[in-house]
Amino acid sequence: SRGLGDVYKRQGMNIAIFIVGHVTKEGTVAGPRVLEHMVDTVLYFEGDRHASYRILRGVKNRFGSTNEIGVFEMRKEGLVEVENPSEFMLSGKPENASGSVVACAMEGTRPMLMEIQALVCKSNFGMPRRTAAGIDYNRVNLLMAVLEKRVGLPLSGYDAYVNIAGGIRMNEPAVDLGIIMAVASSYKNRPVSEDTIVFGEVGLSGEVRAVTMPEQRVAEAKKLGFKVCVVPEVSLKSIGKVEGIEVIGVKSVNQTMNLSLIHISEPTRHLRIS
C-alpha cells in the first residue's frame, strides 16, 4: 500500500486512497500497527447487528477532530445518512413511562438527544444486581451511591438496570443528570414530563456541574419541540434567554428532583421525591 501511494504521488494523481482492514475482538486494528500509523485517518464502522443503523466514528484524524460521528441507516437502497440523529434516537419513545428521561450529549460538535431508561425493582437476593448498557457500569454505580447518600433513596436493596435506547454507547459526563432522573423516576414509579430534557455532570457531593457547549444542547432541544430544559445553574449565563423553551438552572441533585418532578405527567404535578 505504501508503494501504491508512491506511484500516485509520482504521477501527480490528487486522489485519496482507502485501505480496508479488519479489527480484533478488542476493537483495535488487526495486523501490524504500521497500518494505522501510515494512514491519515482511521474510521470505525460500528453498530449492533440487530439494529438498522450504523455509526461511522473517527479514531484517528490528522486533519481534524476525532470526536465527530456519522449516523447511517440501512434501507433497501443501501446505507442512507440520518440527517437528524436526535430525532432518530428518540423515535419509539414510550409516553408517560416511568424511568424514561431524555438527555443531551455531544459527539464532537454535534448535539445528540437520547432516551435514558432505568428499571428499579426490589431485589430478591442479598446482593442487588446492577446492569448498564451503553453507559459505563462504574459510573452508574457511582451515581446510584450519590442518590442514596445525598437524596436518601434506599437503593441498596433494589436491582437497577440502566440503558441508552437505540444501542449507542455514550460516556460523556453530561448524561449524569439524565441517569439520576431516570433511576429516581423508576424508583418512585412516576414519569417525568414528555417535554422535559436534562443535562449536566453530577459530582460526589450531589452538585450539578457545568458541561461544554450548553447553547448548542438547548438549541437542539428547542428544535425537537421540548418545552423545559434543566441545566447546570452555572451555564445559565452562557445560554442566555431562549425563546420557546424554559431553561431552568439547578445547583444540586436535590434541587433537580424537586424542579423536574414539578413537570411530571401523572399522578400529580406537585409531587416531590423525598
PLM regions: where:
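Peripheral, non-AAA+ core regions of ATP-driven protein-machinery
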Residues: G5-R33, H37-L261, S265
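Positively charged, low-complexity/disordered segments
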Residues: S1-Y8, E266-R269, I273-S274
